[in-house]
Amino acid sequence: MLHHHCRRNPELQEELQIQAAVAAGDVHTVRKMLEQGYSPNGRDANGWTLLHFSAARGKERCVRVFLEHGADPTVKDLIGGFTALHYAAMHGRARIARLMLESEYRSDIINAKSNDGWTPLHVAAHYGRDSFVRLLLEFKAEVDPLSDKGTTPLQLAIIRERSSCVKILLDHNANIDIQNGFLLRYAVIKSNHSYCRMFLQRGADTNLGRLEDGQTPLHLSALRDDVLCARMLYNYGADTNTRNYEGQTPLAVSISISGSSRPCLDFLQDVTRQPRTLQDLCRIKIRQCIGLQNLKLLDELPIAKVMKDYLKHKFDDI
């Protein structure tokens, strides 16, 4: 029955033949069929072109041949509105992506959005494809594109704990304070001290509160009784007098959840009673004046190494 159906549908037969050739990496057959007039831009039931198929399968030589014969990498599928570059990002096919990005379509595909507003950079960050993230940024992909839910690639990398991608994106000046300080608050909520330290060292604002309740990272540290996070936040300039929308300071929050002595409560009581030293105030102000984008250039300042280390918080006991 299938044989009879295929005989009556030569187009379907050709489609299956060229897909089988791609799956097998049979470039000779692929090239021959294209030269005989087979279109590289035909679409299957899912809206996939042969470029989608070969990019997802990692068939680099087939991708090259399809591009040489007029394949259009801007075509989006019917599954989620993904281009072939999205699928290359999903599977970490950096060499295939480079072929597409070096084509005349680069500006049309590098920031192309799926139905949910995901760019290839969102996909690469989500799946932890660090070499792919580097490649997209090398070709000047937008570093902070927003999905339909307002999410950036950096946020996805944080949530999925893709540490390498996080560092790469931050090195390319991704907005560390996106969504009013989401990243630092997320690190605090998850008690991820390494992320917390990384964001603080890179200049994350310690005093941005959630839009829904005004809770700052220090309030959240108090809620979690996380004295290590609280100490880091304080050292990097968190204001112990900032109030949430209920009028509570971090100390008041800590007291409200504990009737007895707790590490974070004890720490907040100590730092709230006494003012910061002039030395610490100067460090906080100098880091603010240097600015987010220039903190990584501290080593180039014409000052003593001990001062550079101090500005980097290398002497903090945390």
Curated annotation (Swiss-Prot):
Similarity-based family: Belongs to the ankyrin SOCS box (ASB) family.
UniProt keyword annotations, A-Z: ANK repeat, Cytoplasm, Nucleus, Repeat, Ubl conjugation pathway
Protein name per its UniProtKB record: Ankyrin repeat and SOCS box protein 7
Function: Probable substrate-recognition component of a SCF-like ECS (Elongin-Cullin-SOCS-box protein) E3 ubiquitin-protein ligase complex which mediates the ubiquitination and subsequent proteasomal degradation of target proteins. Plays a role in spindle dynamics and genome integrity by targeting the mitotic progression protein PSRC1 for proteasomal degradation in a cell cycle-dependent manner. Also participates in meiosis by mediating the proper attachment between kinetochores and microtubules.
ANK repeat boundaries on the chain: 13-42, 46-75, 80-109, 116-145, 149-178, 180-208, 213-242
Chief subcellular location: nucleus
Reported phenotype of the disruption mutant: Asb7 knockdown disturbs the meiotic progression and cytokinesis during mouse oocyte maturation.
Gene name as annotated: Asb7
Membrane spanning residue stretches: none
InterPro entries: Ankyrin_rpt, Ankyrin_rpt-contain_sf, ASB7_SOCS, SOCS_box, SOCS_box-like_dom_sf
Organism: Mus musculus (Mouse)
